[in-house]
Amino acid sequence: MDGGGRSLGARALLSLISAGPMSRGDLGERLGLSPATTTRTVRPLIEAGLIEEQPPVEVGGPGRPTSLLAFAPNSATVAGIKLTADRLYAVLTDPLGEVLIGDSLPLTETDAGSVAALIASVVAQLAERSGRRPDAIGISLGAAVVGRRTVVVASFLGWRDVPLAAMVSEATGLPCVAANDVRAFAHAEA
């Protein structure tokens, strides 16, 4: 399977993100799909709000105007949190990583419960100010993290075996992952 094992839907989304709006025919050609398979692939993405159909465009020759498919940048909002020894940095982004709003607060209390509560508070404040509730939260920090959930060791915060993602998820009601900051940066740049 080409596409690195990704589903057809994921490949379609990535194509629209990287190449911009295109017709169903162009998308199908790019992915090597028949017209019927292209339609079956994009229909659930349109229904989920991940892809939007743009108004028809005149093609300049015979035939019907062509509707373009485009990635819907407002389809999701993600909260990103960066913890340092003395500050908490928070942003809300669209799925492409475009920062919508951000804030930075001093980290005066470093026990895990206080930090989880501060994260929940700042995420709620950013959501209120932007009018966009995040769909998920990602936290990065200079620490050993396992399973994208548990901070094994964060010396600068005095933490050992802290289930940070679960704590923040419980405080916010949102899915949450945690990652080592260098790994998170490398993943974002990949």
Model-derived segments and spans:
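Short beta-strand(s) of the beta-wing in winged-helix/HTH DNA-binding folds
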Residues: 23, 52-53, 58
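Glycine-rich phosphate-binding loop and adjoining helix at the ATP-binding site
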Residues: 99-104, 108-120, 124-190
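Conserved phosphate-binding catalytic cores of ATP/NTP-utilizing and phosphoryl-transfer enzymes
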Residues: 56, 60-76, 180-190
